[in-house]
Amino acid sequence: MRRYRRRLRQVQITGASIALASLFRPATDAPARASAGVAAALRILAGLLWLYNVSWKRPPDFGKDSGNGLYGFTQDAVDHPVLPPFSWLVETIVLPNFAFFGWGVLVVETLLAVLLLTGTLVRLAAIVGVVQSLSIGLSVAQTPGEWPWSYWLMIGVHVVLLFTAAGRIAAVDAVRGAAQSRRHTGELAAHRLAGGWGIVLLLTAVLAVALSMGDDPSAPSGATIGGPGLSVSLGSYNLIGAVVLAVVAALMLAATTLHSRMLAVAAGVVAAVAAASLYAQLGRTDAWLGGSNTSAAFFLCAAVVSFATAGQLGRTRRQSRTAARAVGG
């Protein structure tokens, strides 16, 4: 026993020495999978940024009547110009047509949140993220109290995502790539992605149920998962919204357990309908699920993952049945 402990201590010391030495070696030898994992984490972080950003893009006026919100930040491009031609564009085209512009921003930032969090079309999302981050920086970088470097860093993050394998891990792109490979590993990738998202959704639903206990089940403004303090949120849900989220999670987990394409499709349909119901009530104060733009985008993430993985779940069984029928025929 004493010899075992001595050996274990030697291994721990050796491991710590190797880890410490690696900090001083040239940063040229990172394993491909480790780099992909870090890129995936950066992608998810960027997705959470956009997921929170959509929470205060509130139709129908997007802050125009009060001069706050999206309208106030857009007005900063004129009041505190960064690039005069851009300020002219905002003043003469964007502000006079602000409702159209506001909806465009909401759509683009929702798209960024969904694509980056789910790892779908990551390189396309990265390009859109660069453009959107640049437009935000050109609007508010010179506004008093703003930190210009935050916007240059946002641009840099999306450039990194564009040129790295950010869709290799925990991503729909990984499922698509595996499905196209000769090794036919698409089903395993789909199982991992759908199962992982099912767990995340279930934990979120449990927390939402706990926070909404004692409140009106159909309260127009549900409990928020996260908050403005850290600028991180997975949406807000009343008890009904939390139950719907739990149903989606249960369907996704059942789909991975039973290798069922139909259950995955069902999860996608429920999530898509929930998101659509929230979008149908944008601008109202009596949302059925107690949700927000962020809640709708989170449901859309679940829908995208469910539909994207459905075709691969149970694929091996279906191929075996087809082969058996062919032999029997």
Task: Describe the residue ranges of each PLM region.
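Transmembrane-helix motifs of polytopic, lipid-linked glycan transferases
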Residues: 111-118
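Extended, low-polarity transmembrane helix blocks
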Residues: 2-82, 88, 93-107, 120-329
